[in-house]
């Protein structure tokens, strides 16, 4: 059971938005890397748990992972859209 291979498989599943499979692989992945924190952040982002997403993505970004910064930008856009939608009167 290769922990790096599991992390790569989780990332591939996340790119397909397959959160169930990604979670399965993340449970067997190397957890002490910025790439792991980024993947967990993306998992939470896709599931709509923005607080947990921000926590994990910030950890990855603080470790210097550029992709985490891009994912944080995506998270900020989603939060901004939610705020705008909440201001609309239907």
Task: Describe each PLM feature range.
Residues 1, 32-33, 64-65:
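Short helix-capping/linker turns of helical repeat alpha-solenoids
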């Amino acid at each position: 059971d290769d922990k790096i291979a599991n992390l790569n498989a989780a990332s591939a599943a996340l790119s397909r938005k397959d959160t169930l499979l990604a979670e399965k692989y993340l449970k067997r992945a190397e957890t002490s890397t910025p790439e792991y924190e980024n993947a967990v952040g993306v998992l939470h982002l896709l599931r709509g748990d923005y607080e947990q997403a921000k926590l994990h993505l910030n950890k990855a970004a603080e470790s210097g992972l550029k992709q985490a910064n891009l994912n944080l930008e995506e998270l900020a856009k989603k939060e901004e859209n939610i705020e705008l939608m909440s201001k609309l009167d239907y």
